[in-house]
A protein has these predicted regions:
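Charged, alpha-helical scaffolding/interaction elements associated with membrane systems
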Residues: 24, 72, 110-112
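Extended ligand-binding regions for polar small-molecule ligands
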Residues: 1-40, 81-89
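Acidic, polar ligand-binding/catalytic clefts
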Residues: 5, 84, 88, 93-133
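Hydrophobic/proline-rich hinge and linker segments of small-molecule sensing/allosteric domains
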Residues: 3-5, 55-62, 132-133
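Short glycine-rich His-centered loop
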Residues: 54-77
């Protein structure tokens, strides 16, 4: 996942949420469903999740199954489920915006999206433009 350069506050929140989700097995279940085929379903938000901490916008390119793709007019996949689980931990409402892959970093850098996730490889060139978790 990538963040606007210098947005350490959001990146730190993500890293803390990721740590919790790894420890409680949520990430393993997501991988089990989409990659390994060992789980019956992907991530589902708890009914009582509090989303009072605002909105979180994810930029993606939903053409990279199993990481992000459309199913019944909804973006699903590993990255989408990871993002939902993180947003739930942060108490935020998630919006996922589908766009061309080459537009993701620009959307994050300009503030049109809070973060990007699209099976993106971390490269030296990209590390000059955005920060990665």
């Amino acid at each position: 996942m990538c963040f606007k350069k210098g947005n350490t506050e959001l990146e730190d929140k993500f890293n803390a949420a990721i740590k919790e989700l790894k420890e409680d097995g949520t990430f393993d279940k997501i991988i089990g469903y989409y990659i390994d085929g060992t789980e019956d379903k992907g991530y589902e938000s708890p009914a009582d999740v509090d989303r009072s901490n605002g909105k979180l916008v994810m930029a993606t390119n939903a053409a990279f199954e199993p990481y992000e793709y459309y199913e019944n007019d909804k973006i699903v996949g590993v990255d989408a489920d990871f993002a939902k689980a993180i947003a739930d931990k942060l108490g935020m409402e998630l919006t996922i915006n589908d766009m061309e892959f080459d537009s993701i970093i620009a959307a994050v850098d300009s503030g049109k999206a809070d973060f990007g996730a699209a099976g993106m490889t971390v490269t030296d060139e990209r590390k000059q433009q955005v920060d990665f978790s």
